[in-house]
Amino acid sequence: MERLDKIISNRTGISRKDAKAAISAGKVTVSGKIIRSSDFKVGENDEIFLGCNKISGNAHIYIVLNKPKGYVSATEDPEQKTVIELVPPEFFRNGIFPAGRLDKDTTGLMIITDDGDFAHRILAPRKHVPKKYAVTIDLPVTDEMEAGFENGIELSDGICKSAKLLKTGDFTCEVTLSEGRYHQIKRMFGCFGAKVTELHRLSMGGFSLPEDLLPGECRELTNEELALIESKVNE
């Protein structure tokens, strides 16, 4: 069991001093009761609210974000907006970070967490967790591209693992990768003289971006969804 002020500070990013002040002011409830004691011990199943915002009670937090354009995949940046800025107070914790990167102009599924072990399991190259993207290019999608992706395209940093390209329109397709090199999809299409104009991540492992999650919105992942993300590890 942990002190109430410590939990609030760790899971919201506010200082311990401000956490104590909020508790003393009666702004914090634990399982429906106003608690004014900073050293109150919080149980594993207790629900904590700071004002109207619920504070997650799990040991770690796992967030799915529908990343919009214009945000960089970083915890902080002095000149650009980061994906962490999209996380609302009820989900924020000290130490959260984006598990993997999406370019500033790339949209779609992103996982934010404070669990380094989980991030390693889904991102390590040897785990081969598949990631699917919807892609739009400025040239027609060809059979040559499909064959090239399947056979493995040679880039400046080596030959890519086999990737699946499924044509969905004259200029659109879905690409599934099991690795994550720098600007990989853009570079792969560049080998055919094509430029990627839109890139949107649809899924990781067996988990797809929820259709009702609008750009810029996020929510906590359920245990079932976490299991789906890891369901294809090492396949």
What are these regions, as identified by a protein language model?
Residues 1-235:
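Basic, flexible Lys/Arg- and Gly-enriched helix-loop patches that mediate nucleic-acid binding at interfaces
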